Amino acid sequence: MNLPEGTYRIRNVDSGLVLQLEGASRVRVGPDGPPAPTAARRWLIAPVHSGGGIFHMVSEDNERRLDVANASTESGARVQVWRANAFGAQEWIVEEHLDAPGVVSLIACISGLPLEADAEGRVRQGEDTDSPSQWWRLEPA
C-alpha cells in the first residue's frame, strides 16, 4: 500500500475505538478522548525501507514501536510497544481492503497474523478471520 509517512489515529472498525498506549508498554483500544492523553492515541507510521511496503508504528507518547511481545508467532500473542530493535516483531504490512475503501488490515511481519482487538479492548495478533475486529482505519492526526 502506498501510505504517506505521517501521524495517525488507528481506529478499529468493529468497536470504533482507537489504538492507544496505557502506561509504559501496554496497548489497548479505547475512546478517542480522556483519560488517555492525546499523544497516547497518535502513531507515527513510517516505512522501514523506502518503497518496501513494510512499516514501523511508533507511539507519539513514548517513541516506542508497536511490537508483538516476545517476537511470538502464535495466534493470541499480545501486542505492546517496545524500544526499537532489529526484529521483525516491530514491522507491519498495511494491507488495503479493495472492497472497503479506507479499511486496512495490519499484518505482523514476524507471524503473518493480523492485529485484532477483542471486546474487552485487548490488542493481540490472531488467526485471520476477515472480521471487523481485525480491520482498521488510519486517520491522519
Question: Which residue ranges define each predicted feature?
Answer:
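Lectin-like carbohydrate-binding module/patch detector with strong preference for beta-trefoil
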Residues: 1-141
